[in-house]
Amino acid sequence: MTSLVAAFPMYQRAELRPAFDALWSGTRDLLRAEGIAAPDALTTVEDDLLSFWQRPDLLLSQTCGFPFRHFLKDRVALVGTPDFGLEDCPAGHYRSALVVRRDDWRKSLDDLNGATFACNDVHSQSGYSAPLVTAQRAGLRFGAMRISGAHINSARMVATGQADTAGIDAVSWRHMTTFDAWVSGLQVLGWTDPSPGLPFITADTSLAPTLGLCLAQAIRSMPTELRTRLTLKGLVQIDARDYLSVLDPAA
């Protein structure tokens, strides 16, 4: 059998690596039992995720809704979306926390007009698109935008005064409030509307149903401590049309 590649690049941090590795090993073994040549270990992807997601040998990975609807919708198949049981979000959905420093004078969304905005990536649904849509609906316009490269970097830019605000993925924010003491210096000023969460994808449309079943079973079979650490409730199916209907910010 020809080996394929797999990666879980989203939400990775040292504290969660054992849990992600356990999720993969369980998924891998179930896939191999189905005759699918799942790789021994996950591939570490440190840059150019968009190219990785378009590899023809991509067995399984996780992407963001923005690149899916703009670049990947005709190149990959959806496998399923993790449900993290986020407050005020439907299953498999998430939203963005608009954060400011705890000692900042800004106390409402209206106060963000002209604020310097830290963004992990302009192809991010939670870090770029959703915050801008939220601001535009409120009749606001952010000031200068600074690209940070990661949600945790955006939060640090706000904490250190390099930016006034940032949109942080709710799952990432949950992890930060769990593992990073310094975020106590930040507060949530508001939230964006929920949108479909970060989906698992594959290059092989024919394998998508089997991948979804195996991944869902692997989640259910994870050791409780590790699944709890990820705050992972299960896998849900969200139609591609729901991803494609999410609004982009006006130019």
Protein language model features and the residues they cover:
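Hydrophobic/basic alpha-helical segments enriched in Actinobacteria
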Residues: 158, 162, 207-210, 223, ...
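Extracytoplasmic small-molecule ligand-binding "clamshell" domains
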Residues: 1-69
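Periplasmic-binding protein-like
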Residues: 80-82, 88, 94-95, 181-216, ...
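Acidic, polar ligand-binding/catalytic clefts
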Residues: 51-111
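A ligand-binding cleft/hinge motif common to bilobed small-molecule-binding domains
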Residues: 59-73, 159, 164-184
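Short helix-initiation/N-cap motifs at beta->coil->alpha
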Residues: 38-52, 64, 83-86, 144-156
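Conserved beta-strand segments of alpha/beta enzyme cores
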Residues: 77, 141-144, 185-187
